[in-house]
Amino acid sequence: SLVNGQMSYMTESFASMGTNQISVNVTNLSTRSVSVDEMYEFYEDNRDLFAQMTPNVTVSTTVKNGTESSTSTTVSGVSEEYLEMKDMELEAGRFIQYSDIVSRQKVCVVGYYVAWDLYGGVDKALDQTIKIGGNAFRIIGVVSRQDDDELESGGSDDFVWMPYSCAAKMTRNANISSYTFA
């Protein structure tokens, strides 16, 4: 079919560019929305094309530890597959699990900069509470340092990842519209 032919062409095109991820934004569907379950069904039906998928929910908010706060930190809701998709590793702790997503556990994984800037170190950040938009989350993991040059506000180590189910609730967004496939 035309769609399968186009998908094959696109897959070859992405492979030739060295790109192994594709972002999908579902917008302008005035009569209906596409649910997370429907996107997972699409993903499962196309496992020959995709190894992983994650919904992405961006949260614009402040993160705090006591009186220390950051407005430059990127806060995102992701799935349990995100760490592997980003080809990153944990410095300490564990990553978000499927059970965290289903039960909307208020847990998060932070970047190296956040651990040092707000807590003074990786070990000091682990199992501590971080306020995200006024909500208390427990830090369950710290991602290994990404930026070899310097740790800086707004840099590649300045992020917090939480279960996408929590992020969707925080943003009062019942319809997640951004997904990444790998």
Task: Kindly give the residue locations of the regions a language model identified.
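Hydrophobic secondary-structure segments that place a key small or acidic residue at a functional site
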Residues: 56-57, 68-178
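Hydrophobic, regular-secondary-structure patches
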Residues: 3-74, 81-84, 117, 168-171
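Long, amphipathic alpha-helical coiled-coil
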Residues: 1-3, 178
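Short aromatic/hydrophobic contact patches that present stacked aromatics
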Residues: 23, 178-180
